[in-house]
Structure formats: structure tokens, C-alpha cells
Amino acid sequence: MESDLTYYCDELRHLVCLPFSVANLHRMAADLGLKPCWFHNGGGGKYPHYDIPKRRIVEIQAKCKVVSGRDILRIIKGTYGVSSPDALT
């Protein structure tokens, strides 16, 4: 079954998805065969994401749209693709 999630990662091996939610992050991880211990609830819970293990970076990146670290934060904050002054910084 094909996923309705779109995966995004950056060069620092942070991994998120759209539509963004913690539940969807865990679904994405299951789809990609990631271990729950690779989940990070960074920034006191403000920046949840998965880290891609070094040995799987090529495999996982091939299944993702590679974006900047700023775009990863925008996805988490819900401002990715939104035309506003905040989305441009």
C-alpha cells in the first residue's frame, strides 16, 4: 500500500513528513523501518522529528524530498510553503 505521507529530510539527517503530526511521524517511521529510539522530541517537545541513522542515509534520502534545515523547521512549525514574511526567514 502506498503511503499518503510525503517524507522530507535535510543534510543533517533530520526526517519529518507532511501532513505533519507526531502520529504521522511514527507512521512514517514504521513505513521506513525506523526504530522508535531514533525519534527526537527536541526543543522541549517543540521540534519532534526522527534522525536518520548514518548507515541508512542514502536509502532513506532516496525516498524523501531533501530540503534545508530551515524547511524542516517550517514543516514542524506549520509554515512550510506559506507565503508570509515569517516563511521567508
Question: Where in the sequence are the language-model features?
Answer:
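Catalytic phosphate/metal-binding cores of nucleic-acid and nucleotide-processing enzymes, i.e., regions
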Residues: M1-T89
